[in-house]
Amino acid sequence: MQVDKTTLADLSIFHSEEEQSVFHHLNHTQTNGGREYLRHLLGNPLNTLEEILDTQQTIQLLMEVAKDWPITVTNGTIMVIERFYESQLTNFTQHPNAVNSQAYKIFYNHDYSLLRYTVEHAVEFTKGMQQIVDLLYEKKLSKQLATWVTRLSMLLSKPMIQELMRADKKNLTPAEILRYGGFIRYHYKQQNFELVDLYSRFDAYLSVAWACMKYGFTFPGIRQSKDPFIKASGLHHMLLEVPVSYDIELSPDKNFLFLTGANMAGKSTFIKAVGVSAYLAHLGMGVPAKEMQLSLLDGLLSNIQVVDNIIKGESFFFNEVQRIKNTIEKISDGKNWLILIDELFKGTNQQDAVKCSTTVIEGLRKMQNALFILSTHLY
């Protein structure tokens, strides 16, 4: 699905005040990496039906196992492992034994303490990753999850890592600490970074799973169709504490929804609710609705929060016209689009706004490849 930064801002997918964003409401991640990967997911909608359905399956399975998810992997543990590779070790011995490891502990106590602390966290980290494999291994996995679990199994299959998992972290000898620490530092660096990356992905998708359960989201039925359509019942805006629910149906023979009403009547909220739900559907995520069916859309564009640009000398009305012009050019490609327009031409006087709006609406109605929702108080 094609989407631009303006649309992401209009729908509050991200927001400068984070608590007002969709991202914030979906963010139940436990790690910095998971948070950043969730941000990546929300900024990159999927393009194929196969990807969307596979992601739905991923999230639905994680919803099933969320309460059994291992808690041994923490953000602190991951940070310890990452920073270990940034630290310097003095006169580290590659062949530790009972004598030289004890000497290292005495003469290089600071470095030894770092090694011990890191190895203790590595024990918990590898155990936690193995617990994820054990939790998911016999489940009916999505292609995405199957790929991750297979790779996890391979990374954890190293004999030294298997030994590390079985270690009692509170009773390690100095020689064991140096041996495990040396292996992690000099022979398992890239693998550890890959494990961290995999956990970030799990963390991000698990976050969405928790959000879907918390907010009672449902997974929409989505299918390929040459004719665009959206049908939903009980659809509401996920950012509102006490939302109003809507029913909506758009199809090629009813592809233009024209909203009228006084200011603060809820027109903008309705438009954004439809946009957010359609967008989440194309991320493979659940949506805030009792039920939703829609076609795979090629793009989503909005014209909601237009601003002027003093530096460039561009007026509010000029930017409105440019946004509409660019929108029309994009949707002239014959692909399936959802177009959201709130208060068209509010940057000019009422007489000109009526004339401009009428012209634009008459032109848009001829485009059967797109679904339109347009609001106005000019009626």
Language-model-detected regions and their locations in the chain:
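Generic, well-ordered alpha-helical scaffold segments in large soluble proteins
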Residues: 55-58, 62, 125-128, 198-201, ...
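Short amphipathic alpha-helical segments with heptad-repeat character
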Residues: 116, 123, 182-196, 311, ...
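Short helix-capping/linker segments at secondary-structure and domain boundaries
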Residues: 125-138, 210-217, 284-286
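Amphipathic heptad-repeat alpha-helical coiled-coil/stalk segments that mediate oligomerization
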Residues: 86-99, 144-174, 200-258, 262
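Short hinge/gating elements
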Residues: 22-27, 38-41, 180-187, 261, ...
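Conserved amphipathic alpha-helical "coupling/scaffold" segments
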Residues: 1-165, 191, 195-205, 235
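ATPase nucleotide-binding head domains, primarily ABC-like/P-loop NTPase cores
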Residues: 215-379
